[in-house]
Amino acid sequence: MKLRYGSILKVVGLISDSYEEVDTVMLVNNITDGSKYNCKVLDLSTYEIVADFESIEDFITNKQIKILEVIA
């Protein structure tokens, strides 16, 4: 699965521990922030940053999150 910044995904397990709640999120590049967290996850229903990861690979390999669909 090839994800990039700007990818829109349907995921479960990100905001709550429940795998019943599906969230639509976008991966946002935060490299200019200067922190070690370059990958921000934006919840598209609330337009809030809901998670920080060091990289897209870190997001993909997170055991709690399941990617259901890559929309764009």
Language-model segments: residues:
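Short beta-strand-centered aromatic/proline hotspots
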Residues: S18-T32
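Generic structural signal for beta-strand residues in well-ordered domains
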Residues: M1-K2, T32-G34
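A structural detector for beta-sheet-dominated domains
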Residues: R4, V12, V28-N29, L42, ...
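Short coil-to-beta transition motif at edge beta-strands of beta-rich domains
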Residues: M1-I15, Y19
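Short, surface-exposed beta-edge/turn micro-motifs
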Residues: Y5-I8, V22-V25, K36
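Intrinsic-disorder/low-complexity loop/linker signature
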Residues: D17-Y19, S35, S45-Y47
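Intrinsically disordered, low-complexity, charged/polar segments
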Residues: N38-A72
